[in-house]
Curated annotation (Swiss-Prot):
<keyword id="KW-0333">Golgi apparatus</keyword>
<dbReference type="GO" id="GO:0061136">
    <property type="term" value="P:regulation of proteasomal protein catabolic process"/>
</dbReference>
<dbReference type="GO" id="GO:0016477">
    <property type="term" value="P:cell migration"/>
</dbReference>
<comment type="function">
    <text>Regulates ADAM17 protease, a sheddase of the epidermal growth factor (EGF) receptor ligands and TNF, thereby plays a role in sleep, cell survival, proliferation, migration and inflammation. Does not exhibit any protease activity on its own.</text>
</comment>
<feature type="transmembrane region" description="Helical">
    <location>
        <begin position="747"/>
        <end position="767"/>
    </location>
</feature>
<feature type="modified residue" description="Phosphoserine">
    <location>
        <position position="176"/>
    </location>
</feature>
<dbReference type="Pfam" id="PF12595">
    <property type="entry name" value="iRhom1-2_N"/>
</dbReference>
<feature type="topological domain" description="Lumenal">
    <location>
        <begin position="433"/>
        <end position="655"/>
    </location>
</feature>
<dbReference type="InterPro" id="IPR035952">
    <property type="entry name" value="Rhomboid-like_sf"/>
</dbReference>
<dbReference type="InterPro" id="IPR022764">
    <property type="entry name" value="Peptidase_S54_rhomboid_dom"/>
</dbReference>
<feature type="transmembrane region" description="Helical">
    <location>
        <begin position="692"/>
        <end position="712"/>
    </location>
</feature>
<protein>
    <recommendedName>
        <fullName>Inactive rhomboid protein 1</fullName>
    </recommendedName>
</protein>
<keyword id="KW-0472">Membrane</keyword>
<dbReference type="GO" id="GO:0015031">
    <property type="term" value="P:protein transport"/>
</dbReference>
<dbReference type="GO" id="GO:0050709">
    <property type="term" value="P:negative regulation of protein secretion"/>
</dbReference>
<feature type="transmembrane region" description="Helical">
    <location>
        <begin position="715"/>
        <end position="735"/>
    </location>
</feature>
<feature type="topological domain" description="Lumenal">
    <location>
        <begin position="713"/>
        <end position="714"/>
    </location>
</feature>
Length: 855
């Protein structure tokens, strides 16, 4: 075996080029003097200091790292599902996604709900408030390495300050604390070993560009005649610094030119820090380079105590998200620096572009959304409270923003549907009252009459209520068999059962009417069995009839033959599609010219036998093929969409969520888009599209269901319930971040004022307050169940699990109760209309009675 290995080694040596030289150092065993707390380093670059450059050195990995990892048993499907469910709800014990969510929540809170507590400002690095963290004040234990390898004992970072610098109330309201010093283009071991380091809190990777931004850039490139691919590469080649997305992952992010600004003189240090913006495009001066070269030579001085104010003031020119923080006038004179002695190890050769990477990345870092301090928080001037636990702070910093895919998709659908609805159905009269149209129209009696058409005006600049119902608005008679509408249709059919054909004496026409409407002097009312033309059924004359242009004796399709004879009740007769005798039957009701056919008018299922001119004027649905109103189903015509499974029983329950994508007009759609691009988009960046989509849709469905119960005869469109459900998320977010806000009650009353204003605005027509109330309540339950939040200990984590179960059960109970009230035990509320529309005038609110004269 050894001979074969020796042969292979010799063959490899023969193939080695003569210019290649291999120098493999031998492994040096670790001495017994090493401390027990020595931690293995996976990156050799961590051994570099920010202070003084030295030669490159390497540390051999411990022997236990060379061992093969212990095999672990694969997790079962049950454990995987359980762990995934816990991660999704945010109650996992060791979930990185949960920590990211919690850190993001705190960032959102700092933007949306006002100022944080000063303790939070000291332990949190929130770019939205321009504050500086003082949390990297704990000095970690020094790193001991083998003396035979590196020739040194320890590396101590002087920037790692201890707890002695902490003061409980040094940060007053309105003032921001200075940043933890982060040397541009350099890092130390302490910066990475301490969990509270300022460098540790830098964002991992910037998000990709949005689709809209890339589309606009591609369109601009095409307009200029350039290729999209060339434009992208050309922009990437013009970078003067390392992209931020590769700062921490592809490299170890350490400078090629090690910074010695901590040991420089005060004048040079101030000049260096004040010229950071110029270094992006200009080279440093020769004097500064000479001073930097002289600094490592003075390495035999002993260290002294560092003054906290002087240390923090020297770093006030670091870029803080957007802009620069300048030194205040009248500051105390700097104390003289004392040289420190520190042995450092350099690990790599010079690398261009790294010196300015950290400050530029800090300057152009994308703004995150702190938990509880989003867009609404910026408008209401919220901040965190003074003190907050470091565990909560770490949860905030790990949060990453989500892409608002659901918001963009919803906005596109709303815009497209609104444009199509306005283009197809037109725009109704604009206003707050009722619009009346009067004209002279030929009716079924053969004479012209002045008729009036009443229509509710739409101040949203959009289609009429009839058109919105046809598009899929929330309308109870289309979703269930409404008792009042069904009773109204049955009474109309009962009257039609006793009607007959009224034939005018001058043979100008005939129409199906009641005896009261047929003139006894100018026409003949052909009523069976009184009239001699009555047919027989089962050996006796029929008791109901006649029907204009329909008789069982002359109809071939469908024919009235035993055992399929037409029933006695004319309201159950089918539509005759083919007659055998034509217009010469010697029956007066068959040989006349019919002047009226069924027309469905209004939105309550009212049918009237009239002329086509009158039907068109009243915006009805004229049925040329039928002769009786009982042969048509007006509710099917009014509702549109998919036909009912049973024509007598409406079943379009899908209107509960279909109406969420409709709007009453252009202004209504613009209001929804503004809400979605501000509040909804802000929340989706925090919680993700799946959670926000669940809350949005379920809140809207619950709100529409409650509105269908209490306002059954009113057509409603728009995501009113969904929007109030999203507003409820803001309240839940405020409650969850109550412990870290400086003035939570002020934020609560501001949110409450916004909700009360929107509720008052819902007293206008076409705005449903029942959907607002139900959507808000359901949004509260869903937000407590689906939105993870910041945990303040193990007890809080267990409470969250109980909270998820309880609020899910409560929401399901609320939804089940509303379903029972809608389908099983329908209720009628007379005064509920005043809760959603106050009639300031007689024509301000739309009428909902089932009177035949109202439409």
């Amino acid at each position: 075996m050894s001979e074969a290995r020796r042969d292979s080694t010799s063959s490899l040596q023969r193939k080695k080029p003569p210019w290649l030289k291999l120098d493999i150092p031998s492994a040096v065993p670790l001495t017994a003097e090493e401390p027990s707390f020595l931690q293995p380093l996976r990156r050799q670059a961590f051994l570099r200091s920010v202070s003084m450059p030295a030669e490159t050195a390497h540390i051999s990995s411990p022997h236990h790292e060379l061992r093969r990892p212990v095999l672990q048993r694969q997790t079962s499907i049950t454990q995987t599902i359980r762990r995934g469910t816990a991660d999704w709800f945010g109650v996992s014990k060791d979930s990185d996604s949960t920590q990211k969510w919690q850190r993001k929540s705190i960032r959102h809170c700092s933007q949306r709900y006002g100022k944080l507590k000063p303790q939070v400002l000291r332990e949190l690095d929130l770019p939205s408030q321009d504050n500086v963290s003082l949390t990297s004040t704990e000095t970690p234990p020094p790193l001991y390495v083998g003396p035979c390898q590196l020739g040194m004992q320890k590396i101590i970072d002087p920037l790692a300050r201890g707890r002695a610098f902490r003061v409980a109330d040094d940060t007053a309201e309105g003032l921001s604390a200075p940043h933890t010093p982060v040397t541009p283009g350099a890092a130390s071991l302490c910066s990475f070993s301490s969990s509270r380091s300022g460098f540790h809190r830098l964002p991992r990777r910037r998000k990709r560009e949005s689709v809209a931004k890339m589309s606009f850039r591609a369109a601009a490139a095409l307009m200029k005649g350039r290729s999209v691919r060339d434009g992208t590469f050309r922009r990437a080649q013009r970078r003067s610094f390392t992209p931020a997305s590769f700062l921490e992952e592809d490299t170890t992010d350490f400078p090629d030119e090690l910074d010695t600004s901590f040991f420089a003189r005060e004048g040079i240090l101030h000049e260096e820090l004040s010229t950071y913006p110029d270094e992006v495009f200009e080279s440093p001066s020769e004097a500064a380079l000479k001073d930097w070269e002289k600094a490592p030579e003075q390495a035999d001085l002993t260290g002294g105590a560092l003054d906290r104010s002087e240390l923090e003031r020297s770093h006030l020119m670091l870029p803080l998200e957007r802009g620069w923080r300048k030194q205040k006038e009248g500051a105390a004179a700097p104390q003289p620096k004392v040289r420190l002695r520190q042995e450092v190890v350099s690990t790599a050769g010079p690398r261009r572009g790294q010196r300015i990477a950290v400050p530029v990345r800090k300057l152009f870092a994308r703004e995150k959304r702190p938990y509880g301090l989003g867009m609404v928080g910026r408008l209401t001037n919220r901040t965190y409270r003074k003190r907050i636990d470091s565990f909560v702070k770490r949860q905030i910093e790990d949060m990453d923003d989500h892409r608002p895919f659901f918001t963009y998709w919803l906005t596109f659908v709303h815009s497209l549907v609104t444009i199509l609805a306005v283009c197809i159905y037109g725009i109704a009269p604009v206003g707050f009252s009722q619009h009346e149209t009067v004209d002279s129209v030929l009716r079924n009696r053969g004479v012209y009459e002045n008729v009036k058409y009443v229509q509710q005006e739409n101040f949203w600049i959009g289609p009429s209520s009839e058109a919105l119902i046809h598009l899929g608005a929330k309308f109870s008679p289309c979703m269930r068999q409404d008792p009042q509408v069904h009773s109204f249709i049955r009474s109309a059919r009962e009257r039609e059962k006793h009607s007959a054909c009224c034939v005018r004496n001058d043979r100008s026409g005939c129409v199906q009417t009641s005896e009261e409407e047929c003139s006894s002097t100018l026409a003949v009312w052909v009523k069976w069995p009184i009239h001699p033309s009555a047919p027989e059924l089962a050996g006796h004359k029929r008791q109901f009839g006649s029907v204009c242009h329909q008789d069982p004796r002359v109809c071939d399709e469908p024919s009235s033959e035993d055992p399929h004879e037409w029933p006695e009740d004319i309201t159950k007769w089918p539509i005759c599609t083919k007659n055998s005798a034509g217009n010469h039957t010697n029956h007066p009701h068959m040989d006349c010219v019919i002047t009226g056919r069924p027309c469905c008018i209004g939105t309550k299922g009212r049918c009237e036998i009239t002329s086509r001119e009158y039907c068109d004027f009243m915006r009805g649905y004229f049925h040329e093929e039928a002769t009786l109103c009982s042969q048509v189903h007006c509710m099917d015509d009014v509702c549109g969409l998919l036909p009912f499974l049973n024509p007598e029983v409406p079943d379009q329950f899908y209107r509960l969520w279909l109406s969420l994508f409709l709007h009453a007009g252009i202004l209504h759609c613009l209001v929804s888009i503004c809400f979605q691009m501000t509040v909804l988009r802000d929340l989706e960046k925090l919680a993700g599209w799946h959670r926000i989509a669940i809350i949005y849709l379920l809140s809207g469905v619950t709100g529409n269901l409650a509105s269908a119960i209490f306002l059954p005869y009113r057509a409603e469109v728009g995501p009113a319930g969904s929007q109030f459900g999203i507003l409820a998320c803001l309240f839940v977010e405020l409650f969850q971040s109550w412990q870290i806000l400086a003035r939570p009650w002020r934020a609560f009353f501001k949110l409450l004022a916004v909700v009360l204003f929107l509720f008052t605005f819902g007293l206008l027509p076409w705005i449903d307050n029942f959907a607002h109330i139900s959507g808000f309540i359901s949004g509260l339950f869903l937000s407590f169940a689906f939105l993870p939040y910041i945990s303040f200990g193990k007890f809080d984590l267990y409470r969250k699990r109980c909270q998820i179960i309880i609020f899910q059960v409560v929401f399901l109970g609320l939804l089940a109760g509303l379903v029972v009230l809608f389908y099983v035990y329908p209720v009628r509320c007379e005064w509920c209309e005043f809760l959603t529309c106050i009639p300031f005038t007689d024509k301000f609110c739309e009428k909902y009675e089932l009177d035949a004269q109202l439409h």
